[in-house]
UniProtKB/Swiss-Prot annotation:
This is Glutaredoxin-C6. It holds the Pfam family Glutaredoxin. The lineage of its organism: Eukaryota, Viridiplantae, Streptophyta, Embryophyta, Tracheophyta. The gene is GRXC6. GO terms for biological process: cellular response to oxidative stress. Disulfide bonds join 23-26. Expressed in aleurone layer.
Length: 112
């Protein structure tokens, strides 16, 4: 049931970040998306009644147990390091633009 819920959530928005409110790596990724002007859906696992079940389902689905767990256009991107690396390589904005999360006139990278 948690896996179905996770997949449904990922399909419901161009960008989904599974997060924990106290996690500094999660804050960093969400701040980057905000700086880029990207719209995203953040699911705070520590605020969800089934948060631990969702985190286990995400680990089963993606092989990643840690947060943040980032999805763009339904595709698993990874965590904080993966997302920052895509940004540093100039690949994040095109992914976000293709997903419809930002307008195509946005900056190409933000130094985090």
């Amino acid at each position: 049931m948690a896996l179905a819920k996770a997949k449904e959530t990922v399909a419901s928005a161009p960008v989904v970040v599974y997060s924990k409110s106290y996690c500094p790596f999660c804050v960093r990724v969400k701040k980057l998306f905000e700086q880029l002007g990207a719209t995203f859906k953040a699911i705070e696992l520590d605020g969800e009644s089934d948060g631990s079940e969702l985190q286990s389902a995400l680990a089963e689905w993606t092989g990643q147990r840690t947060v943040p767990n980032v999805f763009i256009n339904g595709k698993h991107i990874g965590g904080c390091d993966d997302t920052l690396a895509l940004n540093n390589e100039g690949k994040l904005v095109p992914l976000l633009t293709e997903a419809g999360a930002i307008a195509s006139s946005a900056k190409t990278t933000i130094t985090a």
